[in-house]
Amino acid sequence: MSSSYGNNGDKNNHEKFGFNLLRKKPQQPSNRSERRADDSSSSEDEAGPSSNYVSSSQLNLPSFRPSGGSTDELNRANRTNVGSSDARYSPRTASNTESGNRRQQMIEDDAIATIRDNSGAARCFDDDDEEEEEHQEQKDSGENPADISPRTSGVTKKLQFKSHPSIIPEDTATQDGGEYYEEKDAEKEDQDDSVSTQSSESKMDHFRHLFRRRSTARPHQETNDGRNSAESHSKGGMRNLNGADDEVEDGGFLSKFLSLTGGGLTPAVNNTDPSGENDHERNAGQNNLEDPIPMSDIAATAQQIVQAHSMMAGKSAPGTQHGASGSASSEHPNGEHNLGTEAGVTSPFEPVSPFNQSTDGETMVSSHQDDAFYVPATNHYDDIDDPDDLEPLGIEGSYIAPVDRVRGGVLGSLLKLYQNQDDQYTKSQLSLNDSSIEQTPEPVDQAGKSDQKTGKKIYNPFHKHSKSQTNVSGANKSGSSMNLPNFKATRPKAAAKNLVKAKNFKKKAAAEARITVHIADLLQRQRFILRLCKALMLYGAPTHRLEEYMVMTSRVLEIDGQFLYVPGCMIISFGDMTTRTSEVQLVRCNQGLNLWKLHGVHSVYKQVVHDIMSVEDANMEIDRILTGKNLYPPWVSVLLYAFCSSMVTPFAFGGDWINMAVAFGIGLCVGSLQFIVSQKSNLYSNVFEVTASIVVSFCGRALGSIPNSNICFGATVQGSLALILPGYIILCGSLELQSRNLVAGAVRMFYAIIYSLFLGFGITLGAALFGWIYHDATNETSCSKNISPWFRFIFVPCFSIGLGLINQARWTQLPVMTLISCCGYVVTYFSGKHFANSTEFTSAMAAFVIGILGNLYSRIWKGFAVSAMLPAIFVQVPSGVASQSSLLAGVQSANAIVNNSTTTVVQDDLSGSMSFGVTMIQVSIGISVGLFASTLFIYPFGKKRTGLFTL
């Protein structure tokens, strides 16, 4: 094809787009580039043909030369093209040709400077497939590539700007090979044709060609900007070469105006946004795009996401043990999972378990095993399970072997719950707010897609679904698995997305509910242990085995607990192996005695241990017991106290019928102080024993001083104080010392001794007060008249019944209590006849019989041994004290105080008080030895079955 076609086409196109505006002043030297070209024409004439080409050193440019080519070769090609154009257009003279060549070189120099200042692009490359396709079409059609440019100037998608060969990177030319030289030759021919056909307006024509090529090449430059930006920076692209000085020298007004207007005065040609050319945010992070993608990092990240979110879609089933754990499949052992499918992960609907068993740090989303809430039990350093330590009271059912695992603590469960929520916001910047994985829509980077055609599909930011979105429903539907970001464009269906979102929401809620239920269940179990401990302490359980009861209870409930008992306080520590922490609780209460409520607490404990009653129901039952009222109101207890005082006086202290009546009246006074006044005033309760002993001693000596009244001072005083004697306190202390609970036993025993001294001091003070008032007060401590011993068969059962009722026993418990008490007293009576003045031995024999009967009742009839044995023990204490008459030893000291014989007062008072304390200790030691011996006799080999409480 001739070049005239191209020129005509150019002319038409110029007139079409308004280029004739530039023809009005074609030769004005106002343009800075034209003036510089005219000034340099003389120097170029002297240089000769060898200086037709401007080297890169003159332009302060690096030597960008294609491999295999040089400047001389390019100059020879230029001269060849010029010669061919002269031959084609013979009317032109040689001078015109020379001037045309010089003008052509000046135009090219000015164009290069303008491009260097404004464009910064070396060469716009399309993808290999598109170039091959374009050149194949050109070869098939037989057209010259130089002829295509003017003909397709209106089509902006196929036009590219091919800059001077000297500014083309070397590696680019090496890759393109022959295609590059074809484009170069076509460009040269096009320029030579334009020079040969123009005279005075040739410069403006070349500028029009240049502007058209720049404007049409800009869309392709924007398309491949991400891929070529790193190359232009690393190879010294033209944008990096211009500085402040170069911009002032080379840039003209027209070039700056054109650069600001986006590449020309024809708005129809430019269809790109000029503001995005220097968008630093879009160009940021493009330095290492030519490096290969590290697939190992992607695999590691995928594995982490698999482990964190694998079981989110797994099926869970509620546990059967204590309602706290679920179940799941562990078919795949560790190391069996891989990044298998097209997306690189397994399916979310397949139960993936990175570990065979749940670990401490596992969340409930990724673990549904039955042992998800369990941790290994802590090896506590106690001697409860020491095989060398023989526990003589190891009765049936009270021993529970240590468990291998326990439930995790509250803190560990809360951390699992929070970790469960945090995992949805951490891994790989994925959003799990709506239980679906979506990636932020961003323009697709075309740099890494050399094997794909960019085509005509341009990113549309207003499209609803971008190609970079990855939705979990599409991945699940295609079976590509674990909801990782997929590089393939998928368009999920709304129905499937909503379905998966609902399923994931249900599974997330189920996981949180399971953790919440576990925490609630754990708190219920810990609360049950605390309430059980308080109830046992408050209602009079055997204190020497209280720690063991708590340990066995915690083992049954799978709670990691440690217990330390001191009188009046239980220190409880709940451990958490998950976080290596512990929670310490203190249970403090005054020890009391309530046989019926103690029986109810024991019943609840037994049902919980044998899995008959749930922990929630047990807590409600214990709360009902703790908040429930006593069986008998205080005024009934006062009458019962007086009744018991009158019943104990004949058979224990040798009183007659009159002394029984007097003891009843004084007992009413003492009972009122204990059950009414002491319950309303905490301050008075601290001095109750001393004040009660003072009142009893004062009233008893006053009544006994009445002439011819036959009132025995000693019988009435001891009978009235029999129910407040520290027999039970000393008994518990001796049992604790016998079971090697040294801390509690020593403290309780010392308190019992001081308590006895309080009573002795009160008796002495009351007798001395009445002696100061009445100088003829009686000094006799023994009774002259006694009731027949056969009446004791009536008094002892009545006293036992009264003791049971005062201690809030139900009437159904009274027959067993009365029987055991009568049997114990028979042994005490006949052994006292044979072993005179041997309190310890007599008490030991009686306690042995009482222990045998109580343990047989517990083993055969599955009864409650403690409630059956305690009234019988209380019967033994007054009998032992009465055998020594130590309680009235202070009366002699009172007489000495009244008679002002102070020389022996201190010694007598000390001996009297200490003798009473020693007598109480002797009785308690004999009782404790007898109880241990009876337990060993009933359970010779430590057989343990169902009996839970014993003395």
Swiss-Prot record:
TM stretches of this protein: 635-655, 657-677, 687-707, 711-731, 753-773, 786-806, 811-831, 841-861, 863-883, 918-938
Protein name as catalogued: Pheromone-regulated membrane protein 10
Chain intervals for the UniProt region annotation (Disordered): 1-293, 313-366, 433-487
Top-level division of the source organism's lineage: Eukaryota
Presence of keyword Ion transport: no
Keyword list, A-Z: Membrane, Transmembrane, Transmembrane helix
Pfam families to which the protein is assigned, alphabetical: ThrE, ThrE_2
PANTHER family: PHEROMONE-REGULATED MEMBRANE PROTEIN 10
Assigned GO CC terms: membrane
InterPro entries: ThrE-like_N, ThrE/Ser_Exporter, ThrE_2
Subcellular location: Membrane
Keyword Membrane: yes
Family: Belongs to the ThrE exporter (TC 2.A.79) family.
GO terms assigned for molecular function: transmembrane transporter activity
Species of origin: Kluyveromyces lactis (strain ATCC 8585 / CBS 2359 / DSM 70799 / NBRC 1267 / NRRL Y-1140 / WM37)
Membrane topology: Multi-pass membrane protein
Composition bias type Basic and acidic residues, residue spans: 219-234
Extent of Acidic residues compositional bias: 126-135
Biased composition (Polar residues): 1-10, 68-84, 92-104, 318-332, 354-366, 468-484
Higher taxonomy: Eukaryota, Fungi, Dikarya, Ascomycota, Saccharomycotina
